[in-house]
């Protein structure tokens, strides 16, 4: 949803291909893409669609790199609580970029509360004042039932993501093993969120056509990587925010599809 918003406001999105660095942004990639026209950089960790996240040392190096530029850092940390190995490191932990940083989060992923549409924005006071003014004329406020649900989640359900993550890890491990047996390749191990982003290069390069055929013939829904920009061509995104029984049935159907169409 970020691309149309940027374009609507007259901006030009510039994409960084991270496929060669295990889908992780690096200081070198940042330096290659920032110009005197750059106004902001938008980051998302743990990441949709790859499930990749950053270590504390990686976040710190990136923060130090970005502190050299007079640009805003917009970091979408909506999947922060869905970090599997170790503690999520927020860009907000580094004081030297706080005047540049806008941090986005919410309850949609951490508490599976996609329906209540409650989000949070943190940033320097001078920016929040202006953004609050804009927000007031766009949606006025969050509805009261959603606010009540949010309060309950924050007061009584802070441990909920821990239990959810245990299930996500089990499902991820199952999918990693099963997909590799079926001939898919993984360029990076997902360590957060609830997505896996395998390559279909052993079968075809047309990810869109592949997903359409799997949907029509096997009745399994996956997202073509190219829907996340052209840099995702040749990959597919699979969500494991489902019960294990559903995932296993989906893999059985996918296996039958591959046998029928690719003679595996």
Stretch-by-stretch model annotation:
Residues 1-264:
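PLP-dependent class I/II
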């Amino acid at each position: 949803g970020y691309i149309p918003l940027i374009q609507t406001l007259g901006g030009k999105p510039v994409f960084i291909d991270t496929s060669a660095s295990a889908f992780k942004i690096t200081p070198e990639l940042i330096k290659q893409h920032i110009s005197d026209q750059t106004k902001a950089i938008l980051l998302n960790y743990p990441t949709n669609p790859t499930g990749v996240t950053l270590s504390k040392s990686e976040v710190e190096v990136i923060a130090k790199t970005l502190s050299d530029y007079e640009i805003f850092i917009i970091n979408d940390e909506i999947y922060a609580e869905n970090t599997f190995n170790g503690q999520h490191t927020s860009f907000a932990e580094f004081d030297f970029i706080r005047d540049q940083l806008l941090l986005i989060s919410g309850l949609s992923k951490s508490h599976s509360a996609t329906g209540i549409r409650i989000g949070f924005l943190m940033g320097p006071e001078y920016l929040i004042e202006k953004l609050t003014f804009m927000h007031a004329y766009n949606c006025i406020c969050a509805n009261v039932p959603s606010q009540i649900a949010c309060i309950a989640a924050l007061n009584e359900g802070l441990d909920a993501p821990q239990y959810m993550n245990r299930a996500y890890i089990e499902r991820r491990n199952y999918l990693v093993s099963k997909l590799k047996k079926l001939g898919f390749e993984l360029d990076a191990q997902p360590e957060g969120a609830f997505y896996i982003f395998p390559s279909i290069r052993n079968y075809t390069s047309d990810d869109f056509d592949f997903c359409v055929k799997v949907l029509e013939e096997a009745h399994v829904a996956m997202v073509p990587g190219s829907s996340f920009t052209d840099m995702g061509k040749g990959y597919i995104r699979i969500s494991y925010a489902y019960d294990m029984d559903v995932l296993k049935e989906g893999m059985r159907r996918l296996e039958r599809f591959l046998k029928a169409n690719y003679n595996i």
